[in-house]
């Protein structure tokens, strides 16, 4: 087995999708438990998407599941992750922690990293006054205050690169974003939404190494199309699931298209 056998973002032909995101310091997995469906952490995504057709089936499967601490190999330790599972009906967040498995309804439909999801949701209380509309003067009616700029209704929306700030910003952006009706408009708008929390090289320095957004991806779960961009290539690349043999056993691999694709006009 190679690292290519490990999946972090996936969807199936029924329209169910799942992604694992870093949850370092909070993730915990368990010893094998008799009477449970014991699933290794690295098998979690293919197990859910290989056995469940929709979110309700996934919720039922989770009742009987025990996420085990079986390592992928001696060379690769357990990845510390939490997960979002979604279909057209909604989304849930799954977090395995020292105090047990937590499953949350995810009404905002986004996930970043730490802190745990329930705390992320609590922190949104701090931003309940934010709006995409221009604000009215509630500071003092006797003081003439000027709306000197557009976008003042969202003053206070975080702009730093911490995971809790990115959670708040991408939730606000997603929940207020307006897309057109076409496939291309929806895909375009999706990349703009996630672009609001991109990490640029040099802005997050961790011991001389820089956090960057390596790639961004989305799926049309009804048509089976996977779209992605990379840090080096902003052109959207698409892979069509239904152009491959779904009932076969061969694993199809597509190398990332990197290097900026620039369209010259003269």
Model regions: which residues?
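Short hydrophobic-aromatic micro-motifs
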Residues: 1, 15-20, 93-94
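A short, structured loop/turn motif at beta-sheet edges
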Residues: 12-14, 49-57, 180-187, 221-223
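Short, surface-exposed beta-strand-loop junctions and turns on beta-sheet-rich folds
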Residues: 24-26, 99-102, 109, 232-236
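A glycine-rich, hydrophobic loop/mini-helix early in the fold
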Residues: 11-33
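Compact, glycine/acidic-enriched structural inserts
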Residues: 25-67, 252-258
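Aromatic- and glycine-enriched pocket-lining scaffold segments that form the walls
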Residues: 55, 59-95
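Short, small-residue-biased leader/transition segments that mark boundaries at the very start
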Residues: 2-7
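C-terminus-biased signal that marks the final domain/tail of proteins
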Residues: 70-71, 78-79, 88, 111-266
């Amino acid at each position: 087995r190679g690292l290519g056998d490990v999946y972090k973002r996936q969807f199936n032909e029924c329209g169910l999708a799942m992604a694992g995101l870093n949850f370092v310091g909070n993730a915990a997995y368990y010893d094998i438990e008799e009477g449970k469906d014991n699933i290794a952490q690295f098998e979690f995504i293919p197990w859910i998407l290989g056995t469940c057709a929709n979110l309700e089936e996934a919720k039922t499967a989770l009742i009987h599941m025990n996420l085990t601490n079986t390592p992928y190999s001696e060379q690769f330790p357990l990845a510390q992750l939490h997960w979002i599972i979604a279909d057209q009906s909604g989304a849930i967040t799954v977090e395995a922690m020292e105090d047990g498995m937590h499953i949350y309804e995810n009404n905002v439909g986004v996930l970043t990293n730490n802190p745990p999801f329930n705390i992320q949701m609590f922190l949104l209380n701090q931003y309940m006054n934010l709006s995409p509309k221009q604000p009215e003067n509630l500071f003092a009616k006797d003081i003439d205050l000027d709306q000197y700029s557009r976008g003042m209704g969202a003053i206070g929306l975080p702009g730093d690169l911490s995971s809790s700030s990115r959670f708040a910003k991408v939730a606000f952006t997603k929940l207020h974003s307006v897309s057109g009706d076409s496939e291309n408009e929806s895909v375009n708008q999706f990349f703009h939404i996630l672009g609001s929390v991109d990490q640029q090289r040099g802005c997050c320095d961790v011991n001389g190494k820089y956090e960057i957004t390596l790639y961004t991806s989305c799926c049309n779960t009804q048509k089976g199309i996977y779209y992605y961009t990379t840090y080096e290539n902003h052109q959207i690349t698409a892979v069509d699931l239904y152009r491959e043999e779904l009932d076969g056993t061969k694993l199809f691999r597509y190398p990332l298209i990197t290097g900026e694709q620039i369209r010259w006009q003269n």
